[in-house]
Every structure is written in structure tokens, then in C-alpha cells.
Amino acid sequence: MTITLKTPHTMINAQDKAQLAQKGISEEKFNEQMACFEKGFPFLKLEGAAAIGKGILKPSDAETADYLAAWNDYKNGAHKIVKFVPASGAASRMFKDLFAFADAEYDAPQSDFEKTFFNNINEAAFYADLNAACLRLHGKDIPALLADGAYKAVVKTLLGKDGLNYGALPKGLLKFHRYTEGARTPLEEHLVEGTLYAKGKDGKVNVHFTVSPEHRALFEALAAEKAPQYAAAHDAAFDISFSEQKPSTDTPAANADNTPFRQKDGSLLFRPGGHGALIENLNDIDADVVFIKNIDNVVPDRLKGDTVTYKQLLAGVLVKLQAEAFAMLRKLDEGATEAEMQEMLHWLQEKCFCYAPDGETLTGDKLHKYLKTKLNRPMRACGMVRNVGEPGGGPFLAYNSDGTVSPQILESSQIDMADAEKKAMFEQGTHFNPVDLVCALKDYKGNRFHLPQYVDPLTGFISHKSKDGRELKALELPGLWNGAMSDWTTVFVEVPLSTFNPVKTVNDLYREQHK
């Protein structure tokens, strides 16, 4: 969808044009994005929150067994399966409270968070490394430093570049879990996980990590070092690959008056566009089925059972649904009767919760075209967890630009909270999005879909940041599992809370799920 401007933007100079060309961003794209600052983004029109029986499947034990069998059959066929892990996230936010403690005027832990960190420090998977670094830098081990009241020395050794540098590393490279044979990072846990549900009949496990350029070499080195032992232990062969967000997905920043934000040297300021930029990386992957899960949502081996079961359940739901859609598409090509097309329309409503406002009146060529459009597109099965706390991003039935209603994963920023009815829909949501997706990326003829064409560009959002002490507006691209997959066939499946164990703060590593 092209956003037209009311007034032409004559705000770029020759230096800007060279900068845009270097990043691979067209002037047209730049002007469209600058226009977004003026126009903003519309809220989505909601039909309601999804729930069990209304957009969210809750398979019975018998159905679950069928889905698990379907996935087992599929992965033993001639299909390429890839595990895709967004892993560029820095760990700095994990240590926000410890950075604050290091800068505090007091020297001994005072807050509950600080006390919890030090009281449990000997349980941390990184304890042995930290202890060795303390001995190297301070000539004392952790117990001796704590006995001396040198709490900050321990924290600075953990976070600083002379020590473990955990304050600057990405989460994927930190030691999360202890085992008798040593500690494991999330990268390693994802490799092991891949062997348990994404191994093809040839024994190959394809794992792709998206990383930031400055950490890529560290990821590659750790993967090269660790993969052989996990391959041997799980009778697998790994194909591990990496990619970075493309410079062409960076977005311009704006001043308060919506003019381009310029740096001190006069150049335009661009910022990473958020996880929605990864739709380009996903589009570069040649695979039939792709599993997507965030880097920090991992558990030790003793708790992997639920994760593995429900990943396979999601995949089974997906491949069974896809097989049915493919059969219908072939039927449409051969020539389907009006009655058969009405059955397909009913299938879209019953199985995919995809409704056309004029569905009852669609017939003939119009119905054929509608079915072809809705059946022949990327598909995804998304795990949804029952809300236990405050509602966050979650599953909804929302209106699309063509007037149809379909399942969408929405963030609170996409919903008009000033509208009491919409706010109530958000607050009544029974489930949240844990980022647990299984995606089908090829059509019924075996061709890859071009994923960027299924993005809804009107689902980005504007956030407020600062640079060099100056306020700026930042443009966030449609989120990877939000607007970037807006025009996909989407089904939601209930999964248990036990499959969702993210690490948001360092103290989360002391929770039972990470021991």
C-alpha cells in the first residue's frame, strides 16, 4: 500500500541521496516513511479478542495424538525444516538493576532485587567464570570479596569488558543453565531443542540465528566450538547459519516538527526498524517449515518435554491445515463446482476464522478469486498462553483492509485505548502471545512466497527516543509476528505456560525453570 503525500518533501540534498543509496533505501521509500511521522498510523478495527472456540484451538488428547503423528510423518518426508531464532537482543536490559547498583551512592545491596542477586549468586551458571575473573582482576574469589563488602567489584567484574563483559554481550552468549558437564548458553539450548523436534529424516538440523554485526563472530565461534558435541549426543548433523538485519530496513528519525533528524555532521539519522525488519531475513530462507522462538525462551533438558510436545503439536496443526488448503487450491485449478467452492468458503471460516463481510453473496468468478487469494498465502500456527497477569500483546480477530476479518497478533499500541469498547476487548483477552510460531513458506506448487508483499505497512508505530540529548521520533516497522505477517493464514493454538520461560532480568535465572 503506497502512502501518498499531501505535499512533496523537498528536504533531501545530494549528501542525503548518497547516504540513502549506500543503505539501499529509495528516495520514494524515504519520503513514504517521513510521511508516516505526519500522518501517524491508524488503530486497527477489532472484531474482538480471540478465545477458545473463537480463533483459538484447544485440541483434545485424541486430536493432539493425530497432530503429533502428522508432524512425525511430515518431517520424515522430503521437506526442509529450519529453526529461526531472533538473537540480536542485547543483554544490557537484563542487568539494568545491576548497572544502577554499580552507579549508586551506597555500597551494600539495599533493594530486594540486589539482595536476591547476591544471596543466590553461587547458583548462577556463570558463577565459575565470574569467580575466575574476580581472582584474575582482584586477587580474591567471590566469597572473599563479598566478605570485604566489595559488592560493586563483583558486579563490575560481571558487567565490564575487563571481566565477563555480560553488560555488552547479547543474551544468546550468556551462560544460562548449569549441567554436571558444564554450563550452557541459550544458543546451545536452541541447538539441542532443534534436534528434538526439527530433525529431518537425513538427521540434519537447520538452525538460523539473526544477530547484530558486532557479535556475529562470537556467535559463529561458539557454534563452531559447541555444535559437534551436541550433534554426537543427539545423532544429528547441524547446518547453522547467521544473518543480520539489512541496512535497507533501517528507518529515518524525525524531529518534533516531522522534519528529518540530522546528526551533528549533517547526515540523516537512521535507526534499526525493530524485529519487523527480520521479515527480510525470513524471506531469504529456503524452507518448507520454519519454527520461530526468541533466543531467551529456553529451559534446561529436564524441562524440555512440554516445549518439544507443543512445538510438534503446532507443526502438526500447520501441516494438516496446509495439506487441506493445497488440495483445495488444486481443485480450484482443475475446476471446482459452486457447491465445492461454498465448502471451501465454509472451511476458511471454520478452520481459519477468516470471514468475508459479503461471504454469503460471493459466487462464481468472484468467489473463485477470493478463495484463491485467501488459500494461497503463507500460513502460521501460533502458540497462545493463558493470561496469568496483566494483558499484553495477544490474539485478536481484526478487520483487514479488504474488509475481511481474520486472526491477528496485536500489541497494545495498535489498539485505541481511548475507546472504552476496544479497551474492554483488550482487557478481556484470555491469552497472550509468547512468540511461539511455526510457519509454512511455500505455495502448493512448491514455490517460495515473497513475504514482504504480505506485510501491512499501516501497522508500524512511532516511539519517542533521544539522541545526544535531543528528543526524536523513531519509526518502528510492523512487528515480525504482528503486521509483518498480517496477510498470512493464521491459526492460534493454546499451549501451556510451561513453554514460556523468558529471561528478562538476571534474577530470572534463579527461577526453578532455569535451574
Describe each PLM feature range.
Residues 2-52:
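N-terminal regions that are enriched for targeting/export leaders
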Residues 17-24, 35, 49-388, 397-409, ...:
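Domain-scale recognition of functional cores that engage charged ligands
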Residues 2-4, 72-73, 499-501:
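Non-catalytic interaction surface on structured domains
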Residues 353-380, 389-393, 404-410, 416-515:
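Primarily single-stranded nucleic-acid-binding OB-fold modules
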